[in-house]
Design a protein with these regions (language model features):
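Extracytoplasmic/secretory soluble proteins
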Residues: 2-5, 9-13, 17, 21, ...
Length: 528
């Protein structure tokens, strides 16, 4: 007992000395104590005495004042406090388009050009290496205001999924590589009775097929997305909804519709209710091709291994579509293809945007460079530390208490009881001073995606910041786009009407949005 008591005293003494040495080092490097107000992403209120709040305060010689905001009303709540004259030193901008409104209100500080590289070098290095196109995304009028948070997993495009058993039945041995090969296969699926029931009841494709054909012309259109997507044509940025190549896409798809190759129910989509990612048209054997949902919704049972809480590997559960297929038609075989090459040499398919949010400094920090430097140092330390143990600790809690490594190579952790049932516990204890970074994902599911080249030939928007008037016109323009797609494919509008549609689209606000997009692109995109 005496020995254990001595060990406990020694352990406590060592902990005190360690904290003292950290505090001394902080005072030496950061001589002046600074108070910082910070608005992070959080789903639970942060305790001002949370262990990781205190760790950072000691390490960087700061007092941290965390503003707890309801994430469902995040930007609105921040705006209300700003309207009352309270401007935080550092804050998250939940919706990227709101960068413009904060700029109009003059509540953001300009970040000197070399500050990110100098005072947040690991953030800068990660962005430069993995998402260089976003380094300028937080610029307005040529000045940097926002630090971009970029999704690491939106590097994966939509899947191209084919009925492999149907392909075999109609004599096709490999998935299509070109749009011409795709068209040939779709006709076979519709005309050669691939299910062998003697009925004319199959189709090649339905609504998600629009994304595959548009992608073959370099156009990112996906009716599941409600965001504006832009493409670069020459030196200009134009909305994908009026890209000139779209006229050829619609002419081709009208031909398929007229010939009975495209499911006439494409208007209502492939999902008949329930979980959004399910393609009931594919599951129930109505169509032979789908890009509905994300790649992981189509992974079969055992497609990759998962690590259990005991550290053992076991086959993964099936994705949502794969699970339903196993219940409805367990003999069905499907396979994955590459994005199609079109007649103009382009190849691709829709990919969800990677730009998620921004972080910005309050206007008052513009006059306090020391505070800006200190905030960047904390942000860099928590977001992009080269030590994976440290990074995961400042984002998930104390290793051994809150979580443990299951598979460090694949960056898989196990949250320990009782924290495994406490959503947002890490925010409560102060693991909120970071943003999501585009480090290449290493988890086993993403390893499966790399193996199947889901990271190849995705087309994301050429501009993801949004434009000042985007919110004013977005709903109207999106409705026009969706109505146009249906009208041209079904033949309610002749293809000759396309040029008139473009004029009407531009008149309805599209021209203003396009001008703002080009103004931003020319003013804020720099050569590196």
């Amino acid at each position: 007992v005496k020995s254990n008591w001595k060990k406990a005293v020694l352990f406590l003494l060592a902990a005190v000395l360690a904290l003292s040495s950290v505090s001394f080092a902080a005072r030496k490097r950061y001589a002046k104590k600074i108070k910082i107000s910070w608005v992070p992403y959080s789903i639970q209120p942060t305790d001002p005495k949370g262990i990781f709040v205190k760790k950072l305060e000691a390490k960087f010689n700061v007092d941290l004042d965390v503003w707890n905001m309801d994430d469902s009303k995040f930007d609105e709540m921040v705006a209300l406090r700003m309207a009352a004259g309270e401007i935080p030193d550092f804050f998250r901008i939940q919706k990227v388009v709101n960068l413009h409104s904060y700029h109009r209100q003059k509540v953001m500080a300009v970040i000197p050009n070399k500050y990110l590289r100098k005072y947040a070098p690991h953030i800068y290095k990660c962005l430069k290496k993995n998402a260089a196109m976003f380094l300028d995304s937080g610029r307005l009028d040529g000045k940097l205001y926002g630090i971009p948070s970029v999704s690491p997993t939106n590097i994966f495009r939509l899947p191209l999924v084919y009925r492999e058993d149907w392909m075999k039945k109609v004599g096709v041995t490999k998935t299509p590589d070109t749009l011409a090969e795709f068209e040939s296969l779709m006709y076979k699926f519709a005309k050669e009775d691939p299910d062998g029931n003697g009925k004319n009841d199959t189709y090649g494709l339905s609504r998600s097929g629009i994304a595959a054909v548009c992608g073959a012309y370099g156009i990112p259109i996906n009716r599941a997305s409600k965001d504006d997507y832009f493409v670069k044509r020459g030196k200009r940025i134009i909305n994908a909804a009026i890209a000139p190549e779209l006229k050829k896409v619609l002419a081709l798809m009208h031909k398929w519709y007229k010939d009975g190759v495209m499911d006439p129910e494409f208007i209502t989509g492939e999902n008949a209710g329930g979980y959004w990612a399910l393609s009931h048209a594919f599951i129930n054997g109505r169509i032979g091709y789908s890009s509905h949902g994300n790649y992981y919704h189509w992974i079969p049972a055992g497609g990759y291994s998962v690590t259990t809480s005991s550290g053992k590997k076991q086959p993964c559960d099936p994705g949502a579509n794969a699970k339903e297929i196993a219940l409805v038609n367990p003999k069905m075989k499907w396979t994955y293809g590459m994005p199609l090459e079109g007649p103009n040499g382009r190849r691709g398919i829709f990919q969800f945007n990677r730009l998620m949010s921004f972080f910005a400094f309050g206007k008052q920090v513009e006059r306090d460079r020391r505070k800006m430097q200190r905030i960047l140092a904390i942000f860099d330390f928590c977001s992009a530390s080269p030590s994976i143990n440290r990074r995961y600790s400042y984002q998930n809690g104390t290793r051994g208490k809150h979580w443990v490594w299951l598979d460090k190579k694949h960056e898989e952790i196990n949250k320990l009881p009782p924290y495994d049932n406490q959503d947002g516990y890490n925010h409560r204890i102060g693991c909120v001073f970071h943003m999501e970074m585009p480090f290449p994902p290493k988890a086993l599911r993403e390893e499966w995606a790399y193996k199947h080249q889901m990271n190849k030939y995705g087309i994301e928007s050429a501009m993801q910041v949004g434009v000042p008037s985007g919110g004013k016109y977005a709903a109207r323009l999106m409705k026009m786009r969706d109505q146009m797609l249906i009208a041209f494919i079904t033949g309610d509008k002749p293809i000759s009407y396309f040029n008139r549609y473009v004029k009407e689209y531009r008149k309805a606000g599209g021209a203003i949005v396009e001008k703002e997009a080009n103004d931003w692109y020319k003013s804020n995109t720099r050569r590196r």
